[in-house]
Every structure is written in structure tokens, then in C-alpha cells.
Amino acid sequence: MTTVITRKYRISRRLGVNLWGRAKDPVNKRKYPPGQHGILGFKKLSDFGKQFAAHKKFKFYYAISSKQLRRTFLDAYNRKGYTADNFIGILESRLSSVLYHSGLVPTIYSAKQLISHKHVTVNDKVVNISSYRVKPGDIIKIRERAAKIPVVVEAEQKQERKAPDYLEADSKEHSVKYLRSPQYSEVPYSADMEVNLVVEFYSR
């Protein structure tokens, strides 16, 4: 897990934002990219550069590939309503996103790991696919045998993050109920994700 956290710190510094809101993230003090020439600071970005950077924020925040992110956008674009709201709604309905934002695990990476190791159920059925889309009313739960895994115990003891209004979490039962699809303003991002720039990036 230490390796994962270190990698996350490098990502945050490369993007110039504290992407996951960690208090110890070096980007809080060092506002420049990592590496030998990082101290020179960030280059001024073109409009495309800004759009590309916004796309990378979402890619790293949700720990998904560029291909997955593009598929998500196309799905959002083809739905009725505002593309940006649809985009956020789909990302937040991913099983890994729900588990992470519930506060039952400390990171998106630990959420994905628990899911892939079959430690998570949806409506009492084991689901081992992080991209599985939950529906309003679904109950996600960490299996009893996984309740003593260090990352789960850590999250329960620290309770650093409160579940947003569209989730109903129960730390004692290690469960969370997905109530509804959220809007961008409701998602507890610790940085400005600039979703409109992502829409522009994929709409070129």
C-alpha cells in the first residue's frame, strides 16, 4: 500500500493538485512537478493541454484507463440530459467509486482490490468487477471475512471521510446503500475536476 500511496503522490504533483485530499500529500508544499527539472514549474498550457490535463484527473482519480474513460463519455453523450451530469453519474455508479466514497475503505485502489478478491457483495451476491454499475436501492457490503483486513480496519477506526448525501453508509455493518445518481457539485472531490473541459476534450 505504501508503494501505491507514493505513486499517488507523484500523480498529484504531476497534475499540480491534491487529487485525493490526503493531508500528507507533498503537493501541498511543493507546487511543482516531480523530477530533476520540476522546480522550474508548470508550462503554460494551450486549450487542448488544459482539456487533456482535466481528462487525466478523471483517469487517475477513478483509477481507470483512457479507453474506459472514453467509453464512459460516449455512453453519457448518447443519453438524454446534460452530458457532464450523465458522465459524473456513470462514474459514480461504478462499484469501486461507491465503495470508496462510502468511507469504508481509504483509497480507490483498496476498493478495487477488495472487489477483485471477491470481498464485496451487491444485494448479497458477490461481484468482483470494479466497473459494475450499481442502481438506486442497491446495498453494497464488505463480506464478514474481509472485515479484519488492515485497510478496512484502518478506515473504520479513522473515519476520515463522511459519505456524501447520495450514499447511506453504515460503518458497523461495513455496508453502503446507493440512493441515487449525484450531480457534480455533490461528489466530494478535493480538487476542481473541470468536467466541462473533459466534455470539450472528447467533443473535438
UniProtKB/Swiss-Prot annotation:
Cross-referenced SUPFAM superfamilies: Alpha-L RNA-binding motif
GO molecular function per UniProt: rRNA binding; structural constituent of ribosome
GO BP terms in the entry: ribosomal small subunit biogenesis; translation
Gene Ontology CC: small ribosomal subunit
SMART domains: Ribosomal_S4 (SM01390), S4 (SM00363)
Record bears the keyword Ribonucleoprotein: yes
Protein keywords: Ribonucleoprotein, Ribosomal protein, RNA-binding, rRNA-binding
Residues in S4 RNA-binding domain copies: 93-156
Taxonomic superkingdom: Bacteria
Pfam families per UniProt: Ribosomal_S4, S4
PROSITE patterns hit by this protein: S4 (PS50889)
Family: Belongs to the universal ribosomal protein uS4 family.
Subunit composition and interactions: Part of the 30S ribosomal subunit. Contacts protein S5. The interaction surface between S4 and S5 is involved in control of translational fidelity.
Function, in words: One of the primary rRNA binding proteins, it binds directly to 16S rRNA where it nucleates assembly of the body of the 30S subunit. With S5 and S12 plays an important role in translational accuracy.
Protein name: Small ribosomal subunit protein uS4
Organism per entry: Wolbachia sp. subsp. Drosophila simulans (strain wRi)
